[in-house]
């Protein structure tokens, strides 16, 4: 919890408390913690918290008892058909000192190992068919770059069934006509080149986690964006995808390399 708070606060988010431990870490059953451990230096490099769908309880008001339920509304179809087989992810962080532009190689290493851990979870919990998480952008991130990224995500990863929607969608002031005219590549690959170039021209980069999710599955859904007023007013976009539809290269890299028997997960 302390490492999480330090990492998020350094980027402009966080709870404002000394330690980021909340009711979702302490409830019964609680969220579990996935960490990247550096055995040589004996430090935690990063982590996620997660909860499997079968452990999610539905509150009296119909909301699932998960961290995103104060920002997003979940359709009855989502709760019935998808949630029981979903792994909800949150609080993804990389340790301060491993997340700056100067530490780019270390950052990529930590993120890559986090993805290895997520891949392992899909093996340890074979009943899980979907991953649901969030990507975060901070108040200090340039608005123009933010709008380009959100436009791109909405264009290529829509949620036509409205499975999940933010209660109060982020007001972006987005110039949709200008962005329509900007993204004329005609394909994900070409429009991504435009996005990457334009964001860099504004003096920043596409956040690493956003990049990672965009490269996982062609059928990912983006559920819209809301302000998390309980976490430093960061802007969080819900994302969701089926494990079966992850690109084969990513499956081989992050799922196929995990041997549960070596670690004693299976008899």
State each model region's role.
Residues 6, 40-42, 53-56, 95, ...:
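Short loop/turn segments at secondary-structure transitions that flank enzyme active sites
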Residues 36-38, 50-52, 91, 133, ...:
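Hydrophobic side chains in beta-strands
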Residues 24-35, 58-59, 220-221, 231-237, ...:
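A short helix-loop-beta-strand connector motif used in the catalytic cores of GNAT acetyltransferases and
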